[in-house]
Amino acid sequence: MAEIKSEETSEKKSLNFIEQIVENDLKEGKNGGKVQTRFPPEPNGYLHIGHAKAICLDFGIAAAHGGVCNLRFDDTNPTKEDVEYVEAIKEDIQWLGYKWGNEYYASDYFQQLWDFAIRLIKEGKAYIDEQTSEQIAAQKGTPTQPGVESPYRNRPIEETLDLFQKMNSGEIEEGAMVLRAKIDMASPNMHFRDPIIYRVVKHPHHRTGTTWKAYPIYDFAHGQSDFFEGVTHSLCTLEFVPHRPLYDLFVDWVKEGKDLDDNRPHQYEFNKLNLSYTLMSKRNLLTLVKEGLVNGWDDPRMPTICGFRRRGYSPESIHKFIDKIGYTTYDALNEFALLESAVREDLNDRATRVSAVLNPVKLIITNYPEGQVEEMEAVNNPEHPEEGNHVIEFSRELWMERDDFMEDAPKKYFRMTPGQEVRLKNAYIVKCTGCKKNDAGEITEVYCEYDPDTKSGLPGANRKVKGTIHWVSCAHCLEAEVRLYDRLWKVENPRDELAAIREAKNCDALTAMKEMINPDSLNVLPCCYIEKYAAGMQPLSYLQFQRIGYFNVDKDSTPEKMVFNRTVGLKDVWGKINK
C-alpha cells in the first residue's frame, strides 16, 4: 500500500524537532547512517486518534529518510490482550496509508528477556521481593525523601534464582512475589528505586499459551526489544521522559562491556494528542463499549480510528489535522473544531454532491403538468469538473426541507414563504402560493407555481432570486435512515471533568461518564429522502448532502434501505455556541 503524502509535498516544510534530531544524526554518521523506528501498540484495545499521531511520526520519519518502521506488539500483559485487537490494529495502520517493514511481538523476545534477567540475578543486580504491592509502594519514598530498602534486597543469589524459576513454573501465586532490579533506593529518579521487572501472571497468552507464567514489565521489555531489533530512534510521548534514564540503563546492562556510543536505540519524547470533547483512555473506552453506552468500538462517536473511519473521515483528513498541530515538547489541548476543519477541507475536495431531505414536507408545483418528468443535470463535484454530472429527476411533487418554509416569515427570510420566489437548485424558479395544514395545525403540503422560462441553463434562469433550496422528486428518490452524530461528551475537557466528578461524588468512572455524556450525540432520522443516484453506493463513500453537511454510507445499509452517517456539518456549530 502506498503511503499517503502530506498536503505540503509541493514545498519544503519546516522540520519538527525530532526530524531535526534525525537529520543531525545522519549528518554525523550515527547508527551507520540508517534510520529505524517502530510503532509498539499494546493489543488491549482499538487504536484511537492519539495513536494516529504517533503512527504518522514513526512511519513518516522512517519513510522520509529511506529507513524502515516495524510494527511491534507490546504483548506483555496476557490478561488484557486479544488477537481481535492485533488484527484491528493492523487494519487501522494500513487504512492510514502505511506499510510496516517487519511484524514483531515483545513475546518474540521472552526467552532473551528471561536470560537477561537470569544474568542480572547472577550479577547481583536483581532480587526476588515477597512483600505486598502496598508495602513496596510505601517503601518507594517520595521525590524529596529516599526510599527504604526491601528486607529481601540482599537475599542469596541462588535462592533468588530458585524462586525466579518457581515464578515461571506455576508454583507461585500471582502477587506473591516479584523480581526487582537492584539500582538505587535513594535516587532522585523514582523509576530507579528498584523497579519491578517481572511479575506472575497465570493467564494464557494469545501467542505463547501457558509456556510462561512470569512476564516482564513494560519498562524492562521496551528498551531491550528496541535493541534486539536495531531501532535507532525510539519515539515516545512525554510521560516517558522520566523513564528514559531507566531505558538507557537497561540497554547499557544488556550490552555491558561493549561500545554503546553507536548502533543503539535512543529514546525521544513528543507531546501526545489531547483533544477537546474527547476521552481517549482505553480503559474508559472499553467501559463505554462493555456497558452499552456506545455501539461498539467503531461507533462513529468514538475517538477510535475505526470509529472515525465509519463516521466518514478519510485517512487524508487525519493526516491534514496532524500536520496542522505538529509535534512539540509541551502538552496542549487541541480544539476538536480544528480536527473538523481539516475534515471539511478534505471532504470539500473529495465528496460527491447529492440532494437529500432530512425533515421532509411535500412541495406541489400546481401548474406543472401531471405525469411529466424532466431530467436535470447536477454537478458531481464542483472542485473537480472532470468528474462530470449526474441526472436528477424533476416532477410535479417534490420533497423539500420543512425548515425551508415559513408561513409568516420575517423580512430577511429568503426561502419558501407565500408570495416570494425561490430557486429550486438545478431546476426552476418557483413562487410560493400557500400551504395546507392538518387538524393539529401542522403543515402537510406547500404549494407553488413554476416559471417554465427559468429552467437551469436557460437565459431566464439568470433572473436574480435571493434564495435557493434543494429538493428531491417524490417518485424518484430513496427512503433512507440518517444518523446525526455529534460530540459524545458535553464538557470540553472530559478527562479532567471525569476526575473531578469522581472525587466530588466518590463514584466510579461509569457513573461519572454517564453524567458527562452528551444526550444529543446521536439523533436517528428514520424517514429521510435522497436522490436515487446514491443507490448502490458502497459503505465509506464520501458525500455532501447539499446545504446540510458531509455524510458517509454506513455498513448497516441494505438494498432496501440505505443508512447514512453525518460526518460533519458544513459549519462549526459548536464554535458558535461556545462564543
What are these regions (language model features)?
Residues 240, 244, 248-250, 316-319, ...:
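Core subunits and conserved enzymes of cellular information-processing
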Residues 29, 58, 89, 120, ...:
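Residue-level signal for inorganic ion chemistry
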Residues 1-13, 579:
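Basic/polar N-terminal segments that are highly enriched at the extreme N-terminus
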Residues 71, 75-77, 83, 105, ...:
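Active-site cores that bind ATP or allylic diphosphates and position pyrophosphate for catalysis
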Residues 85-111, 116-119, 124-127:
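A glycine-rich helix N-cap at a beta->alpha junction
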Residues 13-23, 27-90, 206-237:
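N-terminal catalytic cores of NTP/NDP-binding nucleotidyl/phosphoryl-transfer enzymes
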Residues 262-342:
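Long, charged, mostly alpha-helical binding arms that flank functional sites
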